[in-house]
């Protein structure tokens, strides 16, 4: 029984890392999407390269760079390093999700708002973003699912970082049996299945 609790404690840490990472990713992603719509050529190039780099480099390598180079000696908390690493990685995907959600709307709405004298930030915040949320939410849930699976490398990349993977590895080392890994896989599968059902339900409700 204590072994199952140990695995569930690892799962709870994994969920926390995922949630905080996606939350940071959404904040940074919204900022990136907003900056992109300022139509500044230099800013556009910087953001495009930022997105391409983060989407092109495996998340494991990114986490290693953050842990042992960029944040080395600056932040001691492995949990915080993981959140920052995954959050920055997620921001590249979230910014594209938001951009796609905004571009799916009728461009005439922004033009009408601007014609009425609304400043660009106000038009985005009060008219465009609220409508785009309908298209964005299901995709954000899918991003949460993707990041949830990607966090499985945390226990392997960051030394002694406790999460579901680390918990299963610790139990496997104790008993020298494959069951802990199998249980971890089953837990990941069940969680992803539940998240996917939630995403599908949310998408159907938003389409009504």
PLM feature spans:
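Transmembrane alpha-helices and adjacent helix-loop boundaries
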Residues: 1-208
